[in-house]
Curated annotation (Swiss-Prot):
Record GO terms (molecular function): 3-dehydroquinate synthase activity; metal ion binding; nucleotide binding
Source species: Oceanobacillus iheyensis (strain DSM 14371 / CIP 107618 / JCM 11309 / KCTC 3954 / HTE831)
Disulfide cysteine pairs (residue numbers): none
Encoding gene (name): aroB
Protein name: 3-dehydroquinate synthase
InterPro entries on file: Dehydroquinate_synthase, DHQ_synth_AroB, DHQ_synth_fam, DHQS/DOIS_N, DHQS_C
Catalysed reactions, semicolon-separated: 7-phospho-2-dehydro-3-deoxy-D-arabino-heptonate = 3-dehydroquinate + phosphate
Length: 359
């Protein structure tokens, strides 16, 4: 088991990474709580909820609630339902919420914790590769039908407990989804990791190699978060690939593609725009081939959908005064945020579409 620490403006919190940690969560929670409220989804709960409960001999002060798996669960309805469950089960300001699951569970449970009685403690127990990113940094949110993660807060957990044994049961689309965020972190701040990934197929990566990638990705995320917790400056760089990625998620429908698969396509687009904006050459074709080789869906769109995509990108949280703010690369490990008006974005989307049609 390894321990890392993230220093936030509010406090510092530990990240524990190891095997079998789900059986002994109580060992990593020093504070005594009046109630524990475990929030999970139907897929994760059916596999791992009993393992977590095994670590608590008395279930007297433990309650749990299961939501449907999938992005559509990050909704106002589920948020309200969980607040009601917390109240009916007697949670108070000295209770703890445990988010057992992937990014959807972590985002939703974190927002419930941030707002219940004006904020109570919660811990993240991520069970996906993707959640190595979302569980660190304290960004919690639910979706609105007009866009992704538009209702949320910055509210760091008191701990992240990452049992990497749970990653062994992930389906292929969730594996692809998680590695997209690791690719993003490599492009932003770890070229060695990025190039190493391009040299491997996902099927060939062994558990010990995955653990190395996860730790490196978490280090990238934590270093940035420690400098800019509330995304006033450099934390925006962690949104590389997300401007188009979130828009693609919306037009394709939440749950029809994974977040990471959408971000992977957004990364390609970000490299394309960067090459045109800065007149440079980036590993666009290498990344495209790696995505194809690892069976990522290459998402297309029509000329008619470009206007819709632009409007969705303008609802992105980075946008200022209706102007799209997009994270680009001057080179690998050198991210920058630029402003793009509608005509510039339309041109970039059109040239990207033409480029992709030739591949």
């Amino acid at each position: 088991m390894e321990e890392m620490t993230v220093q936030s403006n509010q406090s510092s919190y530990p990240i524990y990474i190891g095997q079998g940690l789900r059986y002994q969560l109580s060992s990593y929670i020093e504070k005594k709580y009046t109630k524990l409220f475990i929030i999970t989804d139907d897929q994760v709960g059916s596999r791992y909820l009993k393992d977590v409960l095994h670590g608590y001999p008395s279930e007297e002060n433990i309650c749990h609630f299961t939501i449907p798996s999938g992005e559509s669960s990050k909704s106002i309805d589920n948020f309200y339902r969980l607040q009601t469950e917390a109240l009916q089960n007697g949670l108070d300001r000295h209770s703890l919420i445990i988010a057992l699951g992937g990014g959807v569970v972590g985002d939703l449970a974190g927002l419930v914790a941030a707002t219940f009685m004006r904020g109570i403690d919660y811990i993240q127990v991520p069970t996906t590769i993707l959640a190595h990113d979302s569980s660190v940094g304290g960004k919690v949110a639910i979706n609105h039908h007009l866009g992704k993660n538009l209702i949320g807060s910055f509210f760091p957990p008191v701990a992240v407990i990452y049992d990497i044994e749970t990653l062994s049961t992930l389906p292929p689309h969730e594996i692809r989804s998680g590695y997209a965020e690791i690719v993003k972190e490599g492009l932003i701040a770890n070229q060695k990791m990025f190039l190493s990934l391009l040299d491997h197929s996902l099927a060939s990566i062994k558990p010990h190699q995955l653990e190395i990638y996860l730790k490196a990705g978490i280090q990238v995320k934590s270093r940035i978060v420690e400098q800019d917790e509330k995304e006033a400056n450099i934390r925006k760089f962690l949104n590389l690939g997300h401007t188009l990625g979130h828009a693609l998620e919306t037009i394709h429908g939440y749950g029809n593609i994974t977040h990471g698969e959408a971000v992977a396509n957004g990364l390609l687009f970000a490299l394309h725009v960067s090459e045109y904006e800065f007149e440079i050459q980036l590993p666009f074709y290498q990344l495209y081939q790696w995505l194809k080789d690892n069976e990522y869906p290459i998402l297309s769109f029509s000329e008619e959908e470009i206007t819709q995509l632009i409007e969705l990108m303008k609802t992105d949280k980075k946008s200022v005064g209706g102007t799209i703010q997009m994270v680009l690369l001057k080179e690998v490990e050198d991210p920058v945020t630029v402003s793009l008006d509608n005509s510039m974005m339309k041109q970039h989307l059109s040239t990207y579409l033409e480029r992709m049609e030739k591949l």
